């Protein structure tokens, strides 16, 4: 697997430098200790304020370096990928940023981190520094374990301790608050994959159709494999287990964390499921969904809960400098406005025609059966969704059969236009809607059905800008409709559609559609998916 990196040994340091530059914060610096000592720190903290230091292995970005800045961390100590920073790197951070007010070390509970931060704390104390250390163990994946892992809940501790330190609280107060928050935070994660270490092969530990519950942020195996049945089930199992373990309160903060490669589209669905769940009304603040404590490219997410108090709400919602911290929000109630009446369906009165119903149903079945094949073909020359787009339109049309004006062809074509325009999406849905709408108008003028469809095709070409030879569905549709308008059989039309579709495989330049952005080498030998769909439909109907 390839990565956007240069030399492997410089992966972490170059990333730190790039992200630090992109932050635009002139008060953030790194210690001059590369490559062994990788410390990101503030330069503007008065010695009268408690310094907040955290860190651990890299590969969890933006944690922890991304949270350095006013209102959160004073320094972050970075190890190599999934490796604890050395004690002298931690000590260097302590000695650099700790003033007379002392410092608090916030340590996710992993053996290497705990030992190296602990040893550095002892050395710093021997040098006269006031140092407190809090170990965060928020992972509830394995019940009864002696040393639960520290995962995304550590951010609750960063934020609240950082707030108190910025306000000028003394070390004892900041440390006590941090310990209290750490003890109350609970986190659980679930993933559809492990993660890929740079230079190593991808591990396919999670079988298709399953998800791993409670795996660690270093890719450690989870507590169990479960059947995966979608976002709702995944959100429900995490929500149920978290609320079983978290302390009682009138409201909670939910931190919804992307573990690396989960799409924002997926994270939006998950946020909706958490907030719509039986316990959703108890969530008074939501942080994310966002990348916060990641595990390289892991396809999963974690959820963390913290019982809220008035003081916690104040601390969590206080503005901070680090851009990686997503401002907590009070969940909004869904508000829906009425559609303008002009946009509502223009459906005509339903009527019965068994032959038309059977013809449309068979057409829809033929198109739905092509979904996987067309998607695979489109993945080579487009964005891989032609089959799904066409199948969506076919499913919508078939599901509305009983509501269509089947005995009134002009109204039927207008209704098909309305349905396809609303259900299919993408350019193809709009183009077909244009064609059927124009065909319906032509039928009203008294022309035959094939001639009306030809008129619809001409309008589609006029508005869409494509023509025969541009490697689109028109290459199959135009000769087929011309044959039907000329009195030829459906079989003859299907044969011409097939010739047109096959010809697109030898067109090395596309004049319209997504394929216009694809190189000639990739187009060669691959027929246009839309043209093939037309040919296969007519062949199935002939």
Model-derived features: positions:
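N-terminal loops that bind phosphate or other acidic moieties
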Residues: 1-542
């Amino acid at each position: 697997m390839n990565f956007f990196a240069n030399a492997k040994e410089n992966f972490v340091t170059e990333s730190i430098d790039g992200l630090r530059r992109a932050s635009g914060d002139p008060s953030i610096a790194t210690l001059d200790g590369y490559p062994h000592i990788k410390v990101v720190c503030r330069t503007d903290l008065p010695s009268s304020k408690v310094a907040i230091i955290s860190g651990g292995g890299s590969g969890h970005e933006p944690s922890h370096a991304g949270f350095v800045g006013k209102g959160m961390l004073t320094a972050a100590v970075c190890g190599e990928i999934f490796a604890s920073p050395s004690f002298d790197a931690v000590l260097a951070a302590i000695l650099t940023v700790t003033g007379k007010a002392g410092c608090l070390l916030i340590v996710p509970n992993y053996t290497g981190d705990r030992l190296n931060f602990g040893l550095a704390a002892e050395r710093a104390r021997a040098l006269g520094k006031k140092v407190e250390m809090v170990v965060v163990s928020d992972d509830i994946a394995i019940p009864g374990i002696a040393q639960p892992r520290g995962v995304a809940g550590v951010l609750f501790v960063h934020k609240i301790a950082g707030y108190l330190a910025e306000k000028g609280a003394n070390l004892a107060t900041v440390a006590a608050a941090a310990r209290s928050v750490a003890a109350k935070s609970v986190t659980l994660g679930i993933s559809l994959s492990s993660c890929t270490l740079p230079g190593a092969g991808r591990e396919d530990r999670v079988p298709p159709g399953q998800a791993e519950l409670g795996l660690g942020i270093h890719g450690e195996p989870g507590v169990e494999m479960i059947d995966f049945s979608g976002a709702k089930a995944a959100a429900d199992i995490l929500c149920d287990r978290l609320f079983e373990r978290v302390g009682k309160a009138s409201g909670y903060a939910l931190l919804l964390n992307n573990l690396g490669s989960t799409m924002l589209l997926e994270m939006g669905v998950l946020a909706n499921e958490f907030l719509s769940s039986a316990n959703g009304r108890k969530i008074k603040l939501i942080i994310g969904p966002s990348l916060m404590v990641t595990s390289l490219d892991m396809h999963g997410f974690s959820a963390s809960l913290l019982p809220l108090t008035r003081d916690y709400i104040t601390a969590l919602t206080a503005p901070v400098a680090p851009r990686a911290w997503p401002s907590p929000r009070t969940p909004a109630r869904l508000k829906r406005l009425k559609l303008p009446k002009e946009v509502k369906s223009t459906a005509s009165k339903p009527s019965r025609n068994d032959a038309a119903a059977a013809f449309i149903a068979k057409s829809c079945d033929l198109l739905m059966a092509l979904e996987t094949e067309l998607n695979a073909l489109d993945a080579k020359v487009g964005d891989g969704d032609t089959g799904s787009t066409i199948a969506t339109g076919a499913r919508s049309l078939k599901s509305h059969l009983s509501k269509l004006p089947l005995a009134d062809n002009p109204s039927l074509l207008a209704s098909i236009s309305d349905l396809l325009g609303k259900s299919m999406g993408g350019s193809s849905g709009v183009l077909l809607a244009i064609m059927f709408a124009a065909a319906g108008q032509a039928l009203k003028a008294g022309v035959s059905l094939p001639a009306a469809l030809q008129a619809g095709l001409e309008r589609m070409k006029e508005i869409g800008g494509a023509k025969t030879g541009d490697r689109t569905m028109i290459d199959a549709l135009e000769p087929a409709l011309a044959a039907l308008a000329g009195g030829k059989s459906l079989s003859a039309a299907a044969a011409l559609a097939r010739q047109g579709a096959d010809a697109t495989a030898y067109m090395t330049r596309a004049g319209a559609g997504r394929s216009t952005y694809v190189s000639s080498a990739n187009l060669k030998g691959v027929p246009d998916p839309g043209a093939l769909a037309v040919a296969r439909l007519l062949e199935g109907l002939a």
